[in-house]
Structure formats: C-alpha cells, structure tokens
UniProtKB/Swiss-Prot annotation:
Residue intervals of the Radical SAM core domain: 46-262
Gene3D superfamilies to which the protein is assigned, alphabetical: Aldolase class I (3.20.20.70)
Pfam family, one: LIAS_N
Enzyme kind, highest EC tier: transferase
Binding positions for [4Fe-4S] cluster 2 per the UniProt entry: C60, C64, C67
Record protein name field: Lipoyl synthase
Organism: Ehrlichia chaffeensis (strain ATCC CRL-10679 / Arkansas)
Family, similarity comment: Belongs to the radical SAM superfamily. Lipoyl synthase family.
Any one Gene Ontology cellular component term annotated for this protein: cytoplasm
Enzyme Commission number: 2.8.1.8
Gene label: lipA
Signal peptide: none
Cofactor(s) named in the record: [4Fe-4S] cluster
Positions contributing to [4Fe-4S] cluster 1 binding: C34, C39, C45, S273
Pathway assigned in UniProt: Protein modification; protein lipoylation via endogenous pathway; protein N(6)-(lipoyl)lysine from octanoyl-[acyl-carrier-protein]: step 2/2
C-alpha cells in the first residue's frame, strides 16, 4: 500500500462527544458506515454529532473492490431498526440525518421498504429533521427506486463511484447506466428532491473520463456531485493508482460548477456524507438563487 501524502493524514478520533455518539449507536444496535467503511473523517464528524447510519445489517451481498464493508450472507432484518434509529436521532438532536445501507440483493424489494420505514419513523418523531438517503441500486428490482422517492427524502444520493471503464474491476455487480437511470428516475418521480452522486478518483481514471461522468450526471438532472480520493482499505482491495493533488480537486470543482451542478464538494477527504447538513443548507440557497435569477430574466 502506498504511503499517504500529508494532505490525507488525519488525527486519531477522540473526545467526549465522539465516545457519546459511539456508545449511543451501540446502545440502539445501529451500524454506521463511518465505522464499517473506515471513513477517515469519523473523528471530525462524530465530534460534531454527525453520523451516517447504515441500515439493513452490517453484511453486504456484494464485494466491491473498493469497499471495506463485510460481504457474505446477511442476517435477517431487525424489525426494530427504524424505531431505534428515530430514537437515536432524537437523542443526538440531529437536524439532518444521513441513512445508507449495505446491498441486500437477497431481499424481494432490495431493502427499499426498510428505507421508507426509517424515513417515516424519523418524521413521526420530529417533522423538522431533514433526511438524506444514500441508497444502493436495489438490483433494479421493480418499484424499489420509486418507493423510496415517493417517501420524499430531502436528498436522494446514489453514488456512481467510478468511471464506466473501471466498473468491471471496481463494481463488478453494478451497472453504470442503471445508476444513471436510478438518479434520473428519482428526479422524474419527485422533482423537489435534491439528487446527489459521488465519484472516487485515484483508481486509474483519466480527467476526460471524469468530465464525461459529470456530463452524464447532469444529463440525469443530478444537483450535487461529490469527488474524493480513493483510499485502499486493506491490501486485498483495489490498489491506489495515484494520489490526486488538492489543486486538481479544485480544478474538478471549477469544471463541475461550469457544467451546471448546484453544489460541488471536491477534495481529498470528501466523502458522500461529509458536511452533509451544511451542504444541504447551501443546496437550498443555491436553488433559491437559481430560481430568482431565472425569474429576473
């Protein structure tokens, strides 16, 4: 594994709030992608009481070459998970919550119904909490995407992850154009929902391929793109081809905005849920400004 440049080095997570969040997640038997995927931002986020809850269990039915989440045969769904999630959101006094999941290709609806239950339970407890979902592709199961879109999360995120050429190596069980179809379907079903997608760089892609992904996402009416450095979780995972410099990330941000995205987060440590609450507020302001500009013209 390559040694990391200085701009990717972070402090070890610690602090009273960090441990409070960790203990609360354990108390309610909730998984977080922060821990399961070994996110480098866990210390910063948890000390701000920001956590991305991972529902549908901790075992994924796929084994993507970039992901640190355990794969295999998953356990049965926890019927109490939606209620426990809502309780934890209340105790943490979250204003914006991010819900993601493992892939559950074994379930008839891919787990989409469980997403809906989680959204409904959180809103039952507090209608003011804004909700962001980061869903898998549900294996293109009939009605799954529409079911979650109809539940009207404030943000619907589905990560494109990498360029089409690398899918066979990095996401062998996924299909690039199905991910685009999912994002387009969400916007068609519920135009008010902000759509979001993320891509990792440093896997061997070219700049031209990244620009094409940006074009494809804009063609699917995606509002928000996140671009971050791929980090190899273990020697068994896909190797890092190179570390993209902060200056290159700034350039990607400039290009993405020029292509019409409402919001762009681009940087070495950017992840799908990084600063999600703050970015949601910026998204709303940017959309309002866009409407005002269109109205004045």
């Amino acid at each position: 594994m390559r040694s990391k440049p200085d701009w990717l080095k972070v402090k070890m997570p610690t602090g009273d709030t960090f441990y409070q969040v960790r203990n609360l997640m354990k108390l309610y038997k909730l998984n977080t992608v922060c821990e399961e995927a070994a996110c480098p931002n866990i210390g910063e986020c948890w000390n701000k009481r920001h956590a991305t809850v991972m529902i549908l269990g901790s075992t994924c039915t796929r084994a993507c070459a970039f992901c640190n989440v355990v794969s295999g045969i998953p356990d049965k769904l926890d019927p109490h998970e939606p209620q426990n999630l809502a309780k934890a959101v209340g105790l943490l006094k979250l204003e914006h919550v991010v819900i993601t999941s493992v892939d559950r290709d074994d379930l008839e609806d891919g787990g989409s119904g469980h997403f809906v239950e989680c959204i409904e339970e959180i809103r039952k407890n507090d209608q003011n909490v804004t909700i962001e979902v980061l869903t898998p592709d549900f294996l293109n199961k009939h009605g799954a995407i529409e079911k979650v879109a109809d539940a009207a999360p404030d943000v619907y995120n589905h990560n494109i992850e990498t360029v089409p050429r690398l899918y066979a190596k990095i996401r062998p069980k996924a299909r690039y154009f199905h991910s685009l179809y999912l994002l387009k379907t969400v916007k068609y079903k519920n135009p008010k929902v902000f759509t979001k997608s993320g891509i990792m760089v440093g896997l061997g892609e070219t700049k031209e391929e990244i620009y094409q992904v940006m074009n494809d996402l804009r063609s699917a009416d995606v509002d928000f793109i996140t671009i971050g450095q791929y980090l190899q979780p273990t020697p068994k995972h896909a190797a890092v081809d190179r570390y993209v410099t902060p200056e290159e990330f700034d350039h990607y941000k400039y290009v993405a905005y020029s292509k019409g995205f409402l919001m762009v987060a681009s940087g070495p440590l950017v992840r799908s849920s990084y600063h999600a609450g703050e970015d949601f507020q910026r998204l709303k302001k940017n959309r309002a400004a866009m409407f005002m500009h269109a109205k004045s013209n």
